Every structure is written in C-alpha cells, then in structure tokens.
Regions:
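Bacterial N-terminal signal peptides that target proteins for export
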Residues: 1-10
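Exported/periplasmic ABC-transporter solute-binding proteins
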Residues: 22-110, 114-296
Length: 296
C-alpha cells in the first residue's frame, strides 16, 4: 500500500484497509469520506489511476465541491477478480465492486437496491507472442480453432496449421474467479471446459506477462492491457474480425465486455463526486489513454 492523500491497494487477495458501511447511502452522524473499491484486475488499475489524478487535482473533498467535507480524499482500490468484487460488496467490506463482465441476475438479486455504473468497454483478444511463427503466417483464427486450442484438443501448433512447428501450445488463462474467464467461457467455450493444463494467471497483467515471456503461449488478453503492451504481444483476429473500438462497440467482434462499478443504494455526496469524475470528459480520456473504450 502506498499513502499520500490517495491510498491504493493492488495486491491480489489482500485485505481491505477498513470495513465499509453497509450500503452506499446510509446516513451516519459524520459523513464517511473514504471510498473502497474491490474487484476486477482489469478495472482496478483504471480506478487507481483515476483516483490518483482526482486526488492530485483536488486533495480535499471540499476543493472538488464546496458543499463537501473539509477532509482528505481517501480512495482504496484492491484487485481480486470480478467475482470477489461482488462478494466484497455483499459482505460490506467494500463500497463498490469492480466487475469486468455482465453482472448475473442471481447476483443482482442479492444486492440491496442494486446500482450499476458503466465506465468503459473492453474486449478479450486472442494474443500470442510476436515470435510465435503463427504471427507470421496467420492473422485470424476461427472460434472453433480457438475452442480446440483452449480445450487442449490441439496440443501442438502444427495441429492448428501444418506449416507450424510441432511445439507444445502453452495455454494461459485468468483464474476461475476472474471476469475474463467467465466472458471467454460464455463467448467461445460454451459447455466445453478449458484444459486443466492451462496456466492460471492471478491478474490480466500477469497473463500478458506470461505471453511476453513464452513464444509458444496463447491467452485471452484484455484489449486495454494489450494496447498498453503494443508490440510485445500479437492479437489475432477472431473469425476474421479484428478487435477495434468500432467492432467492439458494434458487437461484430464477439468477445467484448463492459467495465462496471457496482454498488448498493444511492451514492453519498463524496461517492457521487468521484463517480462523476470517472464519467466526465477528463475521466473518460484517462480510460481511453489506458487502452479501453470510453462510454461517452
């Protein structure tokens, strides 16, 4: 954890600094002036960067809005996966869950006065190391080929294309609690399971790092994180469609996903101030600069 005026925790599975009040809009004798976010390893760095920018600009809440308390801005962000973000919200250990997938109906039903704030759009790219020979002879894979690679039916690269070497395919995925895993399972795998030989990365950054360090690796990399590592990984088209802002937004690129902040109850004044910043032109430009697609 680092401490200035902005506090952020990005250790996977780390405990939160404090216990959040139940619900976002509960009335207390003294208004709560810190905000806690927990969840998606894709979205957590975005909220962290936005929190840093917001804090550096204002420092205290009343500098952002004169009606807010004269108190330091304190924002806590912890990365632990989308499912863990929902759980933290339900447990009351976070004010907001960070979710990089659609929230399930069963999850919404458990959250009192469910609130959802869409701050960006992402996609999953099928990424390989640029030194992988497939990057030189193919620029696209079919959904069926991707399924066979990730299920382990294709074990060596020459099974994908006979001109490729007979080296072992190294499959890299997010851990099962990550939003990316659920999106990939729904959009590509269906009822077919990912091979149990897959390397499960604890974060999207770790997944991309595995692809960068192993030329035989393949994984589903966040579009935003892939953009941050441009030149270090090679993104294949899916069914002939490249992942671009246009194809992701219009749905022609099939493995897209929302970036959501999920809460319970009405926003407090300080929460609204930061949420408004995230969805302002400045906040959306920051999200775009990190490689993701803004919602406005």
């Amino acid at each position: 954890m680092f401490t200035r005026r902005f506090l952020a925790v990005l250790a996977l599975g780390a405990s939160l600094v404090f216990t959040a009040a139940c619900g976002n809009g509960g009335n207390t004798a003294k208004e709560k002036t810190d905000i806690t976010f927990f969840g998606s390893s894709t979205l957590a760095p975005v909220v962290t960067k936005a929190g840093t920018a917001f804090t550096e600009q204002y420092g205290k809440w009343n500098k952002a809005d004169s009606s807010l308390p004269d108190a330091d801005i304190v924002i806590n962000v912890t990365s632990g996966g989308s499912g863990a973000g929902i759980k933290a919200l339900l447990d009351g250990t976070a004010d907001f869950g960070l979710v990089a997938r659609e929230v399930k109906s069963s999850e919404k039903e458990k959250i009192k006065n469910y609130q959802e704030y869409k701050v960006g759009i992402d996609a999953l790219t099928i990424a390989v190391n640029p030194n992988n020979p497939i990057a030189k002879i193919k620029d696209t894979l079919t959904s069926d080929q991707i399924k066979k690679i990730f299920s382990g039916e294709y074990k060596t690269w020459n099974e994908v294309d006979p001109s490729l070497p007979s080296t072992e395919i190294v499959v890299v995925t997010r851990d099962l609690g990550g939003g990316a895993h659920e999106v990939f399972q729904e959009k590509i795998m269906g009822d077919t399971k990912v091979t149990d030989k897959a390397i499960q990365a604890p974060s999207m950054g770790a997944l991309v790092a595995k692809i960068i360090e192993n030329e035989n690796a393949v994984g589903y990399a966040s579009y935003g994180v892939a953009k941050q590592n441009e030149g270090k990984i090679f993104a294949l088209k899916v069914d002939g469609v490249a992942a671009t802002p246009e194809t992701i937004v219009d749905g022609s690129y099939k493995i897209q996903r929302p970036l959501l902040i999920v809460g319970s109850g009405e926003l407090t004044k300080v929460q609204k101030a930061f949420m408004d910043y995230l969805r302002s032109d400045a906040g959306q430009k920051l999200i775009e600069a990190m490689g993701f697609i803004p919602v406005k």
